Amino acid sequence: MNTSTIAIVIGCTFILSGCRVSKPGAMESEMAKDVKHKITVGGKNTPNPIAATPENIKDGQEHFGHHCGICHGLDGEGTGVPFAQKMSPPIPSLSSSDVQEYKDGQLKWIIENGINPSGMPSWKGILSDEEMWKIVNFVRHLPPKGSLGIPAVYKEEQEEHEHMHMHEKDSK
């Protein structure tokens, strides 16, 4: 590498190190919430056709754990998900008023269509309408934070990490 290339790389690194994503202010957050709730998220007037019976909530919990738990945690709070708060935007707590203020049809619409450009994928064509509605029922009846443990994929990773640290301590 020649001197000018090194200078450009160092200059770009210096400039970019000053760039960071700042949290939106209260006014920006409130405006974004209003836009999401009133304009961009469909299904506002669509009622949930699946009754919130214990059986349907349990079915919703199973579908949620299988499809949604890797990002939202098994409890909808991100419990045990190592990157939940590192995403931009962070993965929301599904028990938060921001999420719970959505109508059932809006929650189903989000599950079905996803939210771009966030990491929320579309489940259209993967989950049936009935499965999505059951997930909505589960989201309406979330268990206490941490009560369901952490997703198996992260539990295995955590156990491996702890196992490695135990061996490191033993070898010292």
Question: Positions of the model-derived regions?
Answer:
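Bacterial signal peptide processing site
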Residues: R20-S22
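Short Fe-S-cluster ligation motifs
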Residues: D98-N113
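Electrostatic cytochrome c docking/interface patches
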Residues: A26, E30-H63
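C-terminal motif of bacterial Sec signal peptides marking the signal peptidase cleavage site
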Residues: I15-G18
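Bacterial N-terminal signal peptides that target proteins for export
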Residues: M1-A7
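Flexible coil segments in periplasmic/lumen-exposed cytochrome c-class electron-transfer proteins
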Residues: G42-G43, D104, S122-K172
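Sequence/structural segment immediately N-terminal to covalent heme-attachment motifs in c-type
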Residues: T53-E77, A84, L107-W109
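Detector for the c-type heme attachment site
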Residues: H72-G78, E112-N113, G125, R140
